[in-house]
């Protein structure tokens, strides 16, 4: 993990993103940090200008709640997963649906783009992971191995691997370089409940958040657990590494967001300004803003000010 000195937190409310017609289930920043994407129980995907908070568009099409949304790494596309058993691929510039990916038999709970933006993984209540070709919309592979619903996923930024988390309390790492990845995966065990969220760091560490109220940080290459973070009093809903890997943010159902020191495992800050349930959290690409989503149908941005000894002028 990064051995640098963590910056200090200066917490303040920056702005709200309202106008959702239902609970906010997911949020994601565009790679350049200029746009915020939110998915709602009202079945719509919303696009916001980060700086001003202006609503750019509200996109319908799904016939059920939007459970998850994510930008492609190249910033040209985003994907939305829904209870209607489909994944929709959207063009960012035109705010237009390009294709609907069908194949899941039950609600789709998670989607992830490969680092080159050419493939998309989806998983859900049918216990299956589907790997799609983004350009054609064709399903490339079907990954089977979890014993229960798949709730989370993320691609490794350093190797051609996909991590998936499930209600079976395990994290599976799929080596997509293998011809038959369905039988070529490793399982990370240690949680005692649903793996609700996964997040890779830039260097390839993997964090997993669970309904067992804990967060684990793993080194997937050796299947080793590096550190366990305890402090949430209810389920962990969302996690995010800061770009410098010094901090990890976690959002829970306990009306709070926590910020952790990844090296020591110490909780640096507990942010209690979130109304109702904290659903999601994310850092902007520059690490300056933490976003938390709440069931009160708003988005809240919280600023991060760096005052580390390495940067005394900030």
From Swiss-Prot:
Provide a GO CC annotation, any one: transferase complex
WD repeats span which residues?
19-58, 61-100, 103-142, 145-184, 190-228, 231-272, 274-312
What InterPro entries would the database entry show?
G-protein_beta_WD-40_rep, WD40/YVTN_repeat-like_dom_sf, WD40_repeat_CS, WD40_repeat_dom_sf, WD40_rpt
Give the matching CDD domains.
WD40
Keywords recorded for this protein, A-Z: Repeat, WD repeat
Q: Name one GO biological process term.
A: hematopoietic progenitor cell differentiation
Residue ranges of region Disordered? 294-314
How is this protein named in the record? WD repeat-containing protein 38
Identify the species of origin.
Homo sapiens
Q: What is the lineage of its organism?
A: Eukaryota, Metazoa, Chordata, Craniata, Vertebrata
């Amino acid at each position: 993990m990064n051995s640098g000195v963590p910056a200090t937190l200066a917490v303040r409310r920056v702005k709200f993103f309202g106008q959702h017609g239902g609970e906010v289930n997911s949020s994601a920043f565009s790679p350049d940090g200029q746009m915020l994407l939110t998915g709602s129980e009202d079945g719509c995907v919303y696009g916001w200008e980060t700086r001003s908070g202006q609503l750019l568009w509200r996109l319908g099409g799904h016939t059920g709640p939007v459970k998850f949304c994510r930008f492609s790494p190249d910033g040209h596309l985003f994907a939305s997963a829904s209870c209607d058993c489909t994944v929709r691929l959207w063009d960012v510039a035109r705010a237009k649906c390009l294709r609907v990916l069908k194949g899941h038999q039950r609600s789709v709970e998670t989607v992830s783009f490969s680092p080159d933006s050419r493939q998309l993984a989806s998983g859900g209540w049918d216990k299956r992971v589907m790997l799609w070709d983004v350009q054609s919309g064709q399903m490339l592979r079907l990954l089977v191995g979890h014993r229960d619903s798949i709730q989370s996923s993320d691609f490794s930024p350093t190797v051609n691997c996909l991590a998936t988390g499930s209600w079976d309390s395990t994290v599976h790492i799929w080596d997509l370089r293998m011809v038959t990845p369905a039988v070529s995966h490793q399982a990370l065990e240690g949680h005692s409940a649903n793996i609700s969220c996964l997040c890779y760091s830039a260097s390839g560490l993997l964090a997993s958040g669970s309904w067992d109220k804990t967060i684990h940080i793993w080194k997937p290459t050796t299947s080793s657990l590096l550190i366990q973070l305890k402090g949430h009093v209810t389920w962990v809903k969302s996690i995010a590494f800061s770009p410098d890997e010094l901090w990890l943010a976690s959002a829970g159902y306990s009306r709070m967001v926590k910020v952790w020191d990844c090296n020591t495992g110490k909780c640096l800050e507990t942010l209690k300004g979130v109304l109702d349930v904290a659903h999601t959290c994310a850092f902007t690409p520059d690490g300056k803003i933490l976003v938390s989503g709440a069931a009160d149908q708003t988005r809240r941005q919280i600023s991060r000010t760096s005052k580390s000894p390495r940067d005394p002028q900030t």
